[in-house]
């Protein structure tokens, strides 16, 4: 298998049967992505999922190419917000042309300290596994909400719309015959 498509939950990929589901949160995403790599040995992993927009100008599907751990906070020991102590990877930047994604193990429904374009719960973990395993990584997020007090309701309302939009985008950009 050259391409492996992963998403956190089935509800994000209704009608997209080629997706493997890796669970919610960084630990589930990292562990299950690594298991899938061992089974399928892909050359590229494509992650799709929903995200909250910190940059409220964003709508629809965006490509994320910069990844940060928004809930890694060891500032009390003089590390920066998002920096994992003694880890060489301070952030993961695939390209400067896309948007930044702050990944953490919480659903964001209020302002956060980290300056990123979108927030999710899996992308950094998948990007890190891909980096460590030397696998190309692509990440697309559907803006389901604005990571504010309405985020919970907006996410539920927009979940199915994201799968439809992604299906259209993916069919134009990826060849399923190779």
Listing of model-derived features with the role each one plays in the protein:
Residues 6-10:
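Structural motif
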Residues 1-4:
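Extreme N-terminal starter segment of soluble prokaryotic enzymes
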Residues 11-178:
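Glycine-rich phosphate- or other oxyanion-binding loops that anchor nucleotides, phosphorylated ligands
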């Amino acid at each position: 298998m050259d391409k492996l498509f992963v998403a956190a939950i089935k509800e994000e990929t209704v009608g997209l049967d080629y997706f493997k589901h890796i669970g919610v949160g960084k630990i589930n995403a990292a562990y299950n992505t690594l298991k899938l790599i061992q089974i399928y040995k892909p050359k590229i992993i494509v992650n799709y999922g929903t995200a909250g927009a910190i940059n409220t100008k964003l709508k629809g599907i965006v490509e994320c190419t910069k990844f940060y751990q928004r809930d890694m906070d060891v500032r009390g020991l003089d590390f920066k917000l998002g920096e994992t102590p003694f880890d060489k990877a301070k952030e993961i930047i695939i390209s400067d042309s896309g948007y930044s994604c702050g990944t953490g193990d919480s659903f964001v429904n209020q302002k956060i300290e980290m300056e990123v374009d979108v927030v999710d719960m899996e992308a950094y973990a998948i990007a890190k596994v891909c980096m460590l395993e030397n696998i190309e990584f692509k990440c697309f997020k559907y803006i389901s909400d604005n990571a504010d007090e309405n985020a919970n309701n907006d996410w539920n309302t927009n979940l199915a719309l994201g799968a439809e939009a992604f299906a259209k985008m993916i069919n134009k950009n990826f060849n399923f015959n190779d």
